[in-house]
Every structure is written in C-alpha cells, then in structure tokens.
Amino acid sequence: MYRVPIHEWDESDQPREKLLTHGPTVLSDAEVLALLLGSGTRTSDGPVSAVELGRALLQSYGSLHEVSQRKPKELTRTRGVGPAKATKLAAAFEAGRRVESQRQQDERMQVTCPADVADVYGPLLRDLDKEVFKVVHLNTANVIIGDYTVSEGGLSSSVVEPRGVFEQAILDDAAAVICLHNHPSGNPEPSREDIRITRQLAEAGGTMGIPVHDHLIIAGTKHTSLAERGVID
C-alpha cells in the first residue's frame, strides 16, 4: 500500500503549515508528536510518515501524557523510533516540565499549603528514576526565594546532613525552609529513614533559627506532607 509523504499532502493538512496558519492548539496529539519527531522513517513495509509514528506512539502508550513519561529506551520499542527521535521527544517533554516549574517560581509564589510546593516542584521530581533531595528557601512572607539540591541518588543521614541543608539557606538569607524529595517507586509513604532525617533537620533548624516548615515526599502525581503527619511540630 502506497503511503503519501507529508510533503505531498494538501498544505492545509500538513502539521507545520497548520501550526503556522492556525496556531498549535489546532494540532492533534499525533501531529504535535510528528513535529517533535521531525521526520518519518523507512521500514521494511515502506515509508512511514512522522504523523504515523506519532499515532503509533499514542497507540502504544495510550495518551500524550503517557508518552511523555517514557524513557528514551522505552520509546525506541515503537517501530520506526530510533535513539535520535526518542531523545528529541524526551528533551522536549523535559523542557515542558522545566518551563512549567520555572513559570511558577518566577511568579514568586507564596506558600500557603503543601500543595503549593508540590505544584512547583512535582513536575521536576516525579518522573526521575533516582531520589533527589531539595531544599526550598522562603522569606519571612513564606515566598519562595530559591532552592538547592542537597543530594541525588539516595537518602541517608550520611548524604543529607544539617550542614548541607542549611549552608545555602544561610547564604540566601532564608527565613525558613521546606525540604522535599521524590520516591521513584511511586509510593508516597515516608520510610523510617525519611522520618528520622526530618526530625533531625527540624531540630537543627530550630537551633539555627531557620525552621523547617515541612518535608514533602513527591511520588508521581501524589505527595505526602510530614508536617501534616505530625512529624514536624
């Protein structure tokens, strides 16, 4: 069966022309993926357009969101998607996550509840395959003024210690901090080590005059507040 290449389609049907003429919101999910992929490919059955590759990815994973959660190696399981195309997609989705997180940070958001912090940092942490421990710095009005990554790859008292948590907070003149880390397993329940470290940091913060308002665990789209659990007084 002969497949008509995209460049031979009617201009009004070509994803690039549709975007330039009508804007990105008119594009289907398959067309958005096609523009990110950049081009189609050739298989033993003949040429496959970028839009067809986009449809194949959506069929494989069910939705654009699910495609965005996949690692490059997983994306290459779809026929016609090689490492180059897979890394393009992964980079584009990561850019989107960073833009959303930075947009909320740029608004100098005031923290009124744990969900506020989860909304800002969840997109950056929830899809990682290793644990990352971050500290969010707040001013006296509970507005986010900065953040600092303390450790990557695991959570233990030898990696997360008070000095590493509060040193940068002092330099930023933070009035308080909120700690957070992710659980790649997707389980938002705190471990014994999570609770122990939280109490250790809260005690150190009280001594230094930089209180720890909360410690959030990000797990997928869920989060747990250890302050709400009563771990932090």
From Swiss-Prot:
Q: Which UniProt keywords apply?
A: Hydrolase, Metal-binding, Metalloprotease, Protease, Zinc
Question: Which stretches make up the MPN domain?
Answer: 110-232
* GO molecular function terms listed in the Swiss-Prot or TrEMBL record: metal ion binding; metallopeptidase activity
Ligand binding (Zn(2+)): H181, H183, D194
Query: Which InterPro entries does the record match to this protein?
Result: MPN (IPR037518), RadC_JAB (IPR025657), RuvA_2-like (IPR010994), UPF0758 (IPR001405), UPF0758_CS (IPR020891), UPF0758_N (IPR046778)
**Family, per entry:** Belongs to the UPF0758 family.
Name of this chain's protein: UPF0758 protein SRU_2338
Give the organism the record lists.
Answer: Salinibacter ruber (strain DSM 13855 / M31)
Record lineage: Bacteria, Pseudomonadati, Rhodothermota, Rhodothermia, Rhodothermales
